[in-house]
């Protein structure tokens, strides 16, 4: 969105760490729409020990997890841990020690820990602790949304080709993102939304 504001509407190629992505920005009156095309996605299970450590960080237990979406390392250009919760209340209650979270995220190479609750098969609520970046919580995380879309495809979730994400509602800065999910395993995910000026 910032590139579009400076250079006009268009598609921009970016290099982030080892990943190549494209971003789009288009002005629509006083608003700007933005979209990113992620690198290839992948996911892998995490160990039982690592899961216990992550649950303890947030004070969650196995009983708080949604068994349909197993905890996993997910990647759509950056690494994330996904923990799917089985209630909106548990998502809202999220709290953690930021320094301990940072140490865990740095050690495991996770940009964020993606906490998610599935309201429906295509509508998800998320929070993204971002201690890795020195921030308690990130209000809009396109990379995590792309990684989640890829993971849902990996596990055969009935996403119908797209999911909508409501993120950071509980921090008073709600964002809405859409991930378009092609059928080909590992293929790029398109994430889009409207940008606000900070």
Where are these regions (language model features)?
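Active-site proximal loop and beta-alpha junction motif in alpha/beta enzyme cores
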Residues: 1-198
């Amino acid at each position: 969105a910032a590139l579009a504001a400076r250079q006009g509407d268009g598609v921009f190629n970016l290099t982030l760490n080892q990943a190549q992505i494209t971003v789009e920005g288009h002005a629509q009156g006083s608003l700007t729409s933005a979209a990113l095309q992620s690198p290839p996605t992948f996911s892998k299970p995490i160990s039982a020990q690592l899961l216990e450590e992550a649950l303890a960080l947030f004070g969650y237990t196995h009983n708080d997890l949604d068994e349909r979406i197993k905890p996993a390392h997910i990647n759509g250009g950056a690494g994330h841990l996904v923990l799917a919760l089985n209630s909106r209340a548990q998502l809202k209650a999220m709290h953690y020690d930021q320094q301990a979270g940072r140490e865990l995220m740095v050690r495991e190479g996770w940009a964020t820990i993606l906490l998610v609750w599935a309201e429906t098969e295509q509508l998800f609520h998320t929070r993204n602790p971002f201690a890795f970046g020195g921030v308690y919580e990130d209000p809009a995380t396109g990379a995590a949304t792309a990684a989640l879309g890829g993971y849902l495809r990996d596990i055969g979730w009935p996403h119908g080709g797209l999911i909508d994400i409501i993120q950071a509602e509980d921090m008073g800065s709600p964002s809405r993102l859409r991930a378009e999910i092609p059928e080909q395993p590992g293929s790029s995910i398109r994430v889009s939304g409207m940008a606000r000026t900070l």
